[in-house]
């Protein structure tokens, strides 16, 4: 167990290295921080921290830099979450409030996170495996052509055009709309197939072909939309950190192109807590020089998806964690109000 003084020395090393991008020496630490001890004592503390794997010497005659283990201790014990200022919170809310639909919410969230943290932002669309149907709208476009509009509880809207096998009157369409919503509104996607399986029997024989076509389109839409989707932005920010990656940023960029990798990085959508994965804690080798900060978002207490950022391990953890948490909270509020 490290002493309080050595924890303070580690905190100072992390803060200085993140701020200056330069290895940190004992003389600089005593000049910049009120540690209350001599440079010689700080050197001894740094030697102990190095022996225990919390800091390392990148070059001979250079200062020290934090290791993955050092960053982990900093995040777990030393770094609080930096709160956003009042003006920052208002700017976030005003920017997100301008969104017109779910795609716009996700797009604005990605841009906002990338701008606030100057990292790569990743936002997962709400997981429809946990979504419920808010409403199904059916609109007549022609005697034998119908538009189906599926609206979910998370604000997601999907539209499908349906060519009916026979003309379908307004009265029949209104009847189908009412019967359909009475069965599926407020129900989870997984329950819908069983709820509508005998619905066509309530209609006249000449209309059953069209009803079956509409129901098949609805079920196909539900299956298609349960696929996980995400949006990524701010990859250009990585070019500012070229020297933070041991060889090249290419493995990082390749990893960011793999949706499966990103979904695993963000973790389970049902876990709403803040997660910080540092360096080699990331299972994907191409991301061993990065850190991932993610958190769940959603309406109410249940998280429906994750959002987060990817950047070098030399990251402003308190500021990044604060920005990610604040943005997630506002996105959740928008979903709840939509």
UniProtKB/Swiss-Prot annotation:
State any GO BP term from the record: negative regulation of DNA-templated transcription
The UniProt keyword set, sorted, is:
Repressor, Stress response, Transcription, Transcription regulation
**SUPFAM superfamilies per the UniProt record, alphabetical:** GAF domain-like, Winged helix' DNA-binding domain
Record has Transcription regulation as a keyword: yes
> Which InterPro entries does the entry mention?
GAF-like_dom_sf, HrcA, HrcA_C, WH-like_DNA-bd_sf, WH_DNA-bd_sf, WHTH_transcript_rep_HrcA_IDD
Molecular function as annotated in GO: DNA binding
The entry's family comment says:
Belongs to the HrcA family.
Role summary: Negative regulator of class I heat shock genes (grpE-dnaK-dnaJ and groELS operons). Prevents heat-shock induction of these operons.
What is the protein's name according to its record?
Heat-inducible transcription repressor HrcA
Q: Report the source organism.
A: Streptomyces avermitilis (strain ATCC 31267 / DSM 46492 / JCM 5070 / NBRC 14893 / NCIMB 12804 / NRRL 8165 / MA-4680)
